[in-house]
């Protein structure tokens, strides 16, 4: 290898490392306020919400993966397989839209660099839940550390080293405090897409989706037990922040396989149906409708309930 070629390769490696570290911060770097351990009992004895985020999960790959748990939720719930996730096809803008109920022109997040994050008046799901009732028990678990920076005011907020650990911590929370809203973020599918390709023809990518489905199955077994024995009624939301093409997804606003995603909402008392004209800003209004919370007009949400 010539000196010139070596320098080019070295530069590419350094730039790649800088990109990765800007997106995936280690938990040791998280501010102390992002790690919270208060596992307190939920106040709602019946209505509760399980919000599941599967990072970087293409719709056609989800359908090709044939996960029994995810298939069951699709067959029982409200579904849309052509949901507009909006512009800026990377994770932080996508999750900010889902968790804040507004598009990037309001929440201001347009990249994964959130070192100067400032949502201003456009707060997150947990803040608005607290406004309605300060006593709500709220929990968030993710194995991508930046995810915990997108919300505030949880009682329990924990990072994990793997999707399996997200599942284990979710079971701990369900069995020890049963929050009113439990937010889970699984990151392995996105990681596998970057490693080997976002494609329904990629067996490694499909396996990552199936693996998450297995974890969801275990969690849903606990949810069903609680519903049958304690009379709880759980709304279950399953969404993603973006799809992908090749081994990437950034800057792909015009690619359908990246921009258009899925929504699955299992709502107690509602039969299966396919939704039309859904977008990711509709998730928060739908959750709040189920929890019988009337949004204030000052929140300026961009979406409407899907039922």
Residue map of PLM features:
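Substrate-binding rim/cap in mid-to-C-terminal beta-strand-loop elements of soluble/periplasmic
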Residues: 93-101, 253-294
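Short, structured active-site-proximal loop/turn typified by the sulfatase FGly-forming signature C/S-X-P-X-R
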Residues: 60-94, 101-102
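Metal-dependent active-site segment of extracytoplasmic phospho-/sulfohydrolases and closely related
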Residues: 50-51, 69, 211-252, 287
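Catalytic-site neighborhoods of secreted/periplasmic enzymes
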Residues: 106-166
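Bacterial Sec-dependent N-terminal signal peptides
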Residues: 19-46
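A short beta-strand-to-alpha-helix junction
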Residues: 87, 112-122, 203-210, 270-291, ...
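Active-site His/acidic residue clusters
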Residues: 148-158, 171-214, 218
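Sec-dependent bacterial lipoprotein signal peptides
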Residues: 1-22
């Amino acid at each position: 290898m010539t000196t010139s070629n070596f320098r080019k390769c070295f530069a590419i490696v350094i730039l790649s490392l800088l990109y990765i570290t800007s997106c995936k911060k280690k938990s040791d770097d998280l501010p102390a306020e992002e790690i919270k351990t208060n596992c307190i009992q939920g106040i709602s004895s019946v209505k509760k919400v399980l919000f599941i985020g599967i990072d970087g999960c293409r719709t056609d790959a989800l359908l090709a993966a044939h996960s029994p748990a995810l298939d069951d939720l699709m067959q029982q719930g409200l579904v849309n397989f052509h949901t507009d996730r909006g512009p800026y096809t990377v994770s932080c803008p996508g999750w900010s839209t889902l968790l804040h109920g507004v598009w990037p022109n309001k929440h201001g997040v347009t990249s994964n660099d959130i070192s100067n994050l400032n949502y201003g008046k456009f707060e997150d799901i947990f803040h608005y839940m607290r406004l309605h009732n300060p006593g709500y028990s709220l929990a968030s678990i993710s194995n991508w550390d930046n995810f915990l920076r997108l919300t505030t005011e949880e009682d329990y907020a924990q990072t994990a080293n793997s999707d399996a650990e997200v599942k284990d911590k979710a079971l701990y929370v369900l069995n020890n405090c049963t929050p009113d809203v439990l937010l889970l973020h699984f990151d392995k599918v996105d990681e596998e897409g970057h490693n080997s390709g976002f494609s329904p023809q990629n067996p490694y990518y499909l396996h990552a989706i199936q693996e998450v489905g297995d974890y969801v199955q275990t969690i849903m077994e606990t949810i069903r037990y609680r519903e049958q024995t304690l009379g709880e009624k759980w709304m279950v939301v399953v969404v993603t922040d973006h799809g992908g093409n090749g081994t990437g997804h950034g800057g792909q606003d015009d690619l359908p396989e990246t921009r258009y995603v899925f929504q699955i909402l299992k709502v107690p008392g509602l039969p299966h149906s396919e939704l039309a004209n859904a977008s990711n800003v509709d998730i928060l209004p739908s959750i709040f409708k189920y929890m019988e919370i009337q949004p204030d007009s000052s929140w300026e949400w961009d979406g409407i309930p899907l039922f």
